[in-house]
UniProtKB/Swiss-Prot annotation:
Gene from which this protein is expressed: sprT
NCBIfam families named among the record's database cross-references: PRK04860.1
Species for this entry: Pseudomonas aeruginosa (strain UCBPP-PA14)
Localization (cell): Cytoplasm
SprT-like domain mapped to chain residues: 10-158
GO process terms (BP): response to stress
Cofactor: Zn(2+)
Co-factor binding details: Binds 1 zinc ion.
Name recorded for this polypeptide: Protein SprT
Length: 165
């Protein structure tokens, strides 16, 4: 999997070097990115991080657009310094002029939301007496924190029911 992506990073750098007639230090490439972002360029560390899940699901477009997008951030930073806007004129020049790609800020990949877990708590109110707690809040209760109903002022009690969405 990383061979194609690393080859694309190298190709983007060679295009930039040919265009600007200078060399650029190669970044460290990581596949340790999760969530909604397809890629992130860490400018000061000269590091590119990519989302392996989105890469697997959108390989062709990812290699073409996302890799060039992130490399363009590093090239723009190395050429123009830290005071430029992330998707400003300099970055757009690199995307259009060197890579011949649209300077799109965001991807349109379908991102699967991860399953959420909720722990059901109750109070003594006749209506609206169920409170779904996040795993973090449930852990705090297990460590002794108490939560109270705003209506009846009773301590919320775990029902033992776990909801997975």
């Amino acid at each position: 999997m990383p061979e194609h992506l690393n080859a694309r990073v190298e190709a983007c750098y060679r295009q930039a070097e040919h265009f600007f007639q200078r060399s650029f230090p190669r970044p460290t490439v990581s596949f340790r990115l999760r969530g909604q972002k397809a890629g992130v360029a860490h400018l000061d560390e000269n590091l590119l991080r990519f989302n392996p899940q989105l890469y697997r699901e959108n390989r062709e477009h990812f290699l073409e657009q996302t890799v060039a997008h992130e490399v363009a951030h590093l090239i723009a930073h190395q050429l123009f310094g830290p005071r430029i806007r992330p998707h400003g004129e300099e970055w757009q020049l690199i995307m259009r002029g060197i890579y011949g790609l649209p300077p799109d800020r965001c991807h349109t990949y379908a991102v699967k939301r991860r399953a959420t877990t909720r722990y059901l708590y109750r109070c003594h109110c006749p209506e609206h007496n169920e409170f779904p707690f996040s795993p973090q809040r449930h852990t705090l209760v297990a460590k002794g924190r108490r939560y109270y109903c705003r209506r009846c002022k009773a301590t919320l009690v775990f029902t033992g029911e776990v909801l997975r969405e």
